[in-house]
Regions:
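Residue-level signal for short segments within beta-strands and strand-turn junctions
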Residues: 52, 110, 124-128, 166-168
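Beta-strand-rich modules
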Residues: 151-174
Length: 176
């Protein structure tokens, strides 16, 4: 049976044993881990957890580089916990972009109607429309404040479109 088919609306996040890549453990190759990621994605897993972090970051077989370059290129939001609460928060208000010397300063206001703590995700695009369903559009996520500073290269400055969403502690995201 597929665990995802029997998860009762909960998230399935397989734990992958990156420590098994050590010669003293099982001497796995990088593809032993990436095959498990592919399998989890194919069956609808909500992501992967790696045990132990040091085995990912300092692995001499190149696991970190493989994950960074081919599996986790873009920032990602954590999946929503809809079984705990599915209330959609109001969208941030008063989004402004100002240029301050060699930085862009994005600011927004917490919606007046929201009493709970929120985190924010900033999306961007080089066109007038933003695909918020694509991780490629996420500039930053899990922001706790209401501002973001972005360094810019004055010589290659381009026009960007920005959008900001709010998320609850259950990771339910507002509309942009």
């Amino acid at each position: 049976d597929n665990w995802v088919d029997n998860c009762n609306g909960r998230l399935v996040v397989p734990g992958l044993g990156a420590y098994r890549m050590d010669k003293s453990e099982a001497d796995w190759a990088v593809n032993d881990i990436t095959d498990q990621i592919d399998y989890s994605r194919y069956y609808g897993g909500a992501g992967c957890a790696f045990f132990r972090c040091g085995n990912v970051l300092y692995n001499d077989k190149g696991l970190y580089k493989e994950l960074r370059d081919n599996y986790y290129k873009y920032p990602a939001q954590l999946p929503p916990l809809t079984w705990l609460n599915d209330s959609v928060p109001a969208a941030p208000e008063g989004i402004k972009v100002e240029r301050l010397d060699d930085e862009l300063h994005l600011t927004w206001e917490k919606p007046v109607s929201e009493k709970q703590d929120l985190t924010y995700t900033v999306y961007y695009s080089l066109t007038d429309s933003i695909d918020t369903a694509s991780a490629k559009s996420i500039l930053a996520t899990n922001i706790y404040g209401n501002e973001l500073f972005l360094p810019i290269d004055v010589e290659s400055e381009r026009g960007y479109t920005f959008s900001v969403t709010a998320s609850t502690r259950y990771r339910i995201e507002s509309e942009p």
